[in-house]
Amino acid sequence: MPYITKISAQKNNEERVNIFLDEKYAFSVDLDVLVKFDLRKGKELDELDIIEIQYGDDVKKGFKKALDYLSYRMRSTKEVQDHLKKKGVADSAITEILHMLKGYKYLDDREFAAAYVSTHRKTSGKGPDVLFRELKLKGIDDELIHEALSSFSFSDQVEAAVKHAEKVLKKEKKLSSKETKQAIEQHLVRKGFSFDVISAALQETDYENDDGAEREALEKQGEKAMKRYGYDGSYETKMKVKQYLFRKGFSIDLIDQFLDEKG
């Protein structure tokens, strides 16, 4: 049975040592593993001992990788698991590492979900539907997601949706009232808000143009349509412009008035 003939510190990593069996280099381990397995000069090691020691060292190395990954921000269990797999850590070691991390409270999917909802609803303005999908991708259970989202009240959602709507209004000044409403709805759906929240937000948003603003928007869209269809006053080009403006949400009366003025 081989025995340890030498233990030497590594030059480039003071936390690791090299183990020599029968005067030949065998493997290296973390100092904590050295202590855990009581490795010392003269100790005999059989094949199973070596396998167990190397497994313990794999766990220790993986644990350090996980701590480094967690040092930047909170992570879900799945995020850490995926990271360790990419780093080449064995599945059996990952299972033990995750258990250790949870035991030390470095991993807690309930706290992660709550923090994720709190942060992203404020910084990115995301609605519940988007937050739910993102947390699912991070491996959070449905029950924990719903629990985290319960802090995002209906009134808070409407308030957030109204802020989004106001941003759309500032950006889309050349649209008809109908198109502006559609733009707001589409934006809020993409952000992850429910139709009930969107409906409530629209009631608190002044998206309808006054007569002057609607006419100004129509003229801008009308000039654009005339260039596109080569408007020459003919029935054919007039109908193309008319259909274009109608699809944009302008009233027939306003469109006819515009075209009559253009001749």
UniProtKB/Swiss-Prot annotation:
Keywords: Cytoplasm. The gene is recX. One of its GO terms (cellular component) is cytoplasm. The keyword Cytoplasm applies. It comes from Bacillus licheniformis (strain ATCC 14580 / DSM 13 / JCM 2505 / CCUG 7422 / NBRC 12200 / NCIMB 9375 / NCTC 10341 / NRRL NRS-1264 / Gibson 46). Belongs to the RecX family. This is Regulatory protein RecX. GO terms for biological process: regulation of DNA repair. It comes from the Bacteria. Modulates RecA activity. It is found in: Cytoplasm. InterPro entries: RecX_HTH_1st, RecX_HTH_2nd, RecX_HTH_3rd, Regulatory_RecX, WH-like_DNA-bd_sf.
